[in-house]
Amino acid sequence: MEQGEASPPVPAEHEAKCDTSNNEEEGELFDFDSGDEVPEADRQVPSADDRTRGAEAGGADENTCPAGNGTGAEPAPEAEPAKLVVPTKVNPYSVIDITPLQEDQPSSPDANTEEEGVGLRVPSGYSVPVPCGYAVPSNLPLLLPAYSSPVIIRAESVEEEEAAETVGDGQCNSLSSEDLPHSSEQGSQEGSALARWAADPANTAWMENPEEAIYDDVPRENSDSEPDEMIYDDVENGEEGGNSSPEYGWSSSEFESYEEPSDSEGKNGIPRSFLRSSHKKQLSHDLTRFKAHCEEKMRGLVASTVGAMEIQQAKQRQERKMQKLMKAAKEGTKDGLEKTKAAVKRGGSFIRTRSLVSQDHRCYFEEEQNLFIDVDCKHPEAVLTPMPEGLSQQQVVRRYILGSIVESEKNYVDALRRILEQYEKPLSEMEPRLLSDRKLRMVFYRVKEILQCHSMFQIALASRVSEWDVVETIGDVFVASFSKSMVLDAYSEYVNNFSTAVAVLKKTCATKPAFLEFLKLSQDSSPDRVTLHSLMMRPIQRFPQFILLLQDMLKNTAKGHPDRLPLQMALTELETLAEKLNERKRDADQRCEIKQIAKAINERYLNKLLSSGNRYLVRSDDVIETVYNDRGEIVKTKQRRIFMLNDVLMCATASSRNSHESHAVMSQRYLLKWSVPLGHVDVIQYNGGSGAGEHCRHHAAHSPESLAVVANAKPHKVYMGPGQLYQDLQNLLHDLNVVGQISQLIGNLRGSYQNLNQSVAHDWTSGLQRLILRKEDAIRAADRCRIQLQLPGKQDKSGRPTFFTAVFNTLTPAIKESWVSSLQMAKLALEEENHMGWFCVDDDGNLAKKETHPLLVGHMPVMVAKQPEFKIECAAYNPEPYLSNESQPASPSTARGFLWIGSCSNQMGQVAIVSFQGSNPKVIECFNVESRILCMVYIPAEESKPQETTETKDPEATASRAPHVPTICLGTEEGSISIYKSSQGCKKVRLQHFYAPDKSTVMSLACSPQGLYAGLVNGSVASYTKAPDGSWNSEPQQVIKLGVLPVRSLLLVEGALWAASGGQVFMASVETHTIENQLEAHQDEGMVISHMAVAGVGIWIAFTSGSTLRLFHTETLKHLQDVNIDAPVHSMLPGHQRLSVTSLLVCHGLLMVGTSLGVVVALPVPRLQGIPKVTGRGMVSYHAHNGPVKFIVSATAFQNKDRARDSPRSGSELQDEDPKDLLCSEEGPSCPGQPDTYTSVWLGDSLGLPTQKNDLSSSSGSLNLSHGSSSLEHRSVDSSLCDLLRDPSASPRSRPQGSRRARASSALVVCGGQGHRRVHRKARQPSQEDLVSSVMVWQIPLLGM
């Protein structure tokens, strides 16, 4: 025999590829590895026992199996002696152990019966293994077979599936059931030949000395032969297995000896028909055919097998996974147990030998369908009864909303049925097949399961609708139907698969015109002509629709209605479900997008770079790149696409190409221009530092060098773009200063001249001021969409780093704001302090890395002089108003206010003011107070009426009145209440100072538009009102006596004052000052309430001792949830120290808890107006204070209501305003209604004008415009330039009313305590600096908002 004949035949192409269209389980449900797609090189061919299972019924093993049992139901014999049990039914996907039998194994009665029925008796010393069919000496050392390795099922890509279908869709397997009769007849003949040969004593004489004879195809366990090379391909490692070694499979030593004669073998009488040698003997015709059949089967087996160790490892992984699942089921709920059982069922199909028998797939489909309840039975539809008479208006509205819910659900279920009946069913039945079974499952994945979930919901809905006039509740039906884990599983798998399904449909439409025609016919035949894509979008849109409907229902449900709490719970469940779906979809999309980008980019090294590690796509944007020459002129513009990854920024040119000539299917390809590490990317902003935005104002002049657009441009060149606009503004400011000096000199003239007088000089000044306003508008318009990046370049010849500048323009100002914010967040996440910022474990106890955890911006001391005797006690945040327009995000993404921090020593207090106006927070003022500060609260400015604004002439008088400026109220230990003015640029100004009744210590403060409330140490609450002049009355209007214990916490909840005294919470009316209700927060004696935080319709309560938080419903006062933070904290911190809650905050989907150990715990909660229950595991910060966390506050900007509905006005509109309307108080932009977006930017030094302020006031407040001036020589030039560069959204006539605002991508949270430390770092003795009062600033990503 030739050497090439020893190699097993490569499986037929149609056999290998036909499996891709079989109905097998995708590898997404129960993945034991990373979950990513298996590389092409690692794909495994079908295992041999499955490929030959159909032939075993007619082969040599037919003699050991009953007739007709061709599905492999015979139990696999084990290596260890054990009693063989023949099961009635075997899962065709389970792993079958095909270890050869031992002679000393006790044979089961069933096996004997089978042998007798067949009539073949195997001689002593032999056993016939089920899968192989050739005899093995029973006393040879056992080897685990290498052809029963498990196959990890994975989802093939669309390209692989397309390649498989080019061979032919729907080809039958070569080992189908149609070949069984012929195989059975042939096997019977070969079996009789084996029996006749084995009965001859001459043929078995060699067994007397078995140690000298081994088969070449059954290697000895103690063989010391060293195979030199492998002549078989590494079937496990695919094409990459070219350099195979014996550890991967069968070596050449096991087959090369077949060519050579062996004297010892001949002497001992081993039948050469089993040795595969070239020696020819007189063999019977039957035995020759049997030998050839065994050789062919053996080659097929060996070619499709992998190492025996793989199956053992897979079994161990399965056992570990099962142990974890059962542990989770025992610790979870009944629903979790059912989910575990379903997962175990699914998991059994993932570690199995791949089967090509169609019956196996039918069994699998039956198994998968059994995971969901079939509710296709007839049930009555949900139909509202006729509306009875005498209903209130609210009841009528609720009935209409219920009708909308019923009609919406009916249409949704009909859409799901149309997908299955009009598309999936015809495609699965038509011949020839347009979509393979595998593609059908990819396209319509989990649609049936979603339909079953909603069919059950429809049954419950119909039952409730039928009794609506009696019950009038619907929220509990939603809670019961959509709080099940099966709903989350079905929807998440559908949503994650949606993009893949759409890709399959698009590609099939392009490659198969018949499929496109089928979709068109199906659409035309439908009454509403809805496309398949629109129908498939319905599940993605369903939960937002539910949330909107329930919100409408809740708005029309009065307090005290029995359906109100169930509706709020339903909203919470739906929002939590939607949030989890979004999170899973986001994770799946990030992995998918990075693979698509890696495939579409032409750089090979970058392709490998993108495919490695935990890299994911943050965002991609289409922008216009502008290129300038040395003179600052625009050379060209080019459309680019910027890919922002979590650690890389890439710029590429997008190009489309036709993938098929006959159909216009465009596939994106990218030509990479540059890629740089994200940490080296800097945004150049002319009008402020990073994050300052357009609200930052500068006194210092910008040099021409800093305004250049090109990095290496020369200072004396003239530049276009924002740099040139800033230079023009500088020139105008210079000229205005000169004209001011000329005006003063003209006043010294003693003569009278026609064209040289004060009137002319005033006209010059007014004209320059108008030009300055126009120039500022042009700068703002140019900067709104412009992103200028400084990027690292190649090193120069001397090895020094170089930089280059890229200028991009986004499509809208909102995109620019969002892009810059995303860049800031991504760079922040790369900093060393955030690499391990939070400790979080999953359900299995493993560390889980979350991308939405708060990021540490920084930590800083808050004392001007480091004084460790002052310890932080409380804080209050004073937000600055911002203008809400389309050019800026109506969001708290960038705080622009001031944080007042109160610290205490033994006898006195100190206030530090931290400003968030710039890119980095900094302490701008610090002063002492007479007594220890225990609490403080921010009091917003009272909105002034329009007539009061026009009548006010004196800006100083306006600023001094308390109602029109924001203030901070301090409560001290000595019982005094101090009111301080708080606004931009102001110094310490105390407006009022008075004492509480009996000079009782002020423990807590709260304010409302009606009054100021102080919780006292004697168990009373003092209520203060405002005097006619806007100041607070020093005597309380009412003192509410609650008890004898201190009032530690005050909250205003829906017009009622909640006061915590001891372990009780009292609800008092802010109008009548009477106690309306009270709540017993804890039944244990000695539990004292320390903190309260309200969100939605729930209130979280913490206690001075213990680590448990309690959630109560604010309307019914029902106890809803308990959360103990002890477990997550002590999972991270060593030892077991006493833990208590020292601060509390609910914001942006997180319940943030400050602890006595200095760490912060963040628990996820919903964001809507539902119940803020904790929906997941908590995170514990690795950044901590050296003492208790004294406060946690949210640094959130608020909208300027006076100008929120107005649009930005241009300079031409401002010049027509009355001068008195442009006057501003000394507070500048912080004045209520002052649009700081429209004001000019003073970039030069003080101009010496009488109206110029020395603080941060805007230039529009210092302008006294003159009417009637017509001497503006440069007006036409500057006007045209301004019109070209002004943002179209600045005009109210050109802006659409429905234009979208930018969304916030992050929010700031500040916590304070003593010093800063990093948990789990080497412990050291804290120094004096470590005990200084400090704050930590966190930035919270808002990905889900």
Swiss-Prot record:
Residues 242-255, 1256-1271 have a biased composition (Low complexity). Pfam families: PH_19 (PF19057), RhoGEF (PF00621), WD40_2 (PF19056). The modification N5-methylglutamine is found at Q1314. Residues 307-335 form a coiled coil. The modification Phosphoserine is found at S157, S355, S1262. Residues 102-111, 171-191 have a biased composition (Polar residues). Residues 397-584 form the DH domain. InterPro entries: ARHGEF10/ARHGEF17, DBL_dom_sf, DH_dom, WD40/YVTN_repeat-like_dom_sf, WD40_repeat_dom_sf. Residues 40-54 have a biased composition (Basic and acidic residues). Residues 22-39, 224-239 have a biased composition (Acidic residues). Methylated at Gln-1314 by N6AMT1. One of its GO terms (biological process) is myelination in peripheral nervous system. May play a role in developmental myelination of peripheral nerves. This is Rho guanine nucleotide exchange factor 10.
